Regions:
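A domain-level signal for the structural core that forms small-molecule/cofactor-binding pockets
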Residues: 2-70
Length: 70
């Protein structure tokens, strides 16, 4: 039974997560020739303050800059 774990920074809508689950299930089922009802998908969401990029929190790394860039 394939088990897929996805970690995302918070902010996706329920509809986006539902689509992700459906598409991952299809891809795994097709690739591994496994019935879709045997595929498990878990989504774990992390806050932007708890995710680091280059030594700084994602919330800081991706914050808009004074010049309008991020």
């Amino acid at each position: 039974m394939p088990f897929v774990q996805v970690t995302l920074v918070q902010g996706r809508t329920p509809a986006q997560k539902h689509t992700l689950i459906a598409e991952l299930t299809k891809a795994v089922s097709t690739t591994l020739d496994t019935p879709a009802d045997r595929v498990r998908v878990a989504i774990y969401e992390v806050s932007a303050d708890d995710w680091g990029i280059g030594g700084v929190p994602y919330s800081v790394a991706r914050a808009p800059q004074p010049d309008g860039t991020s």
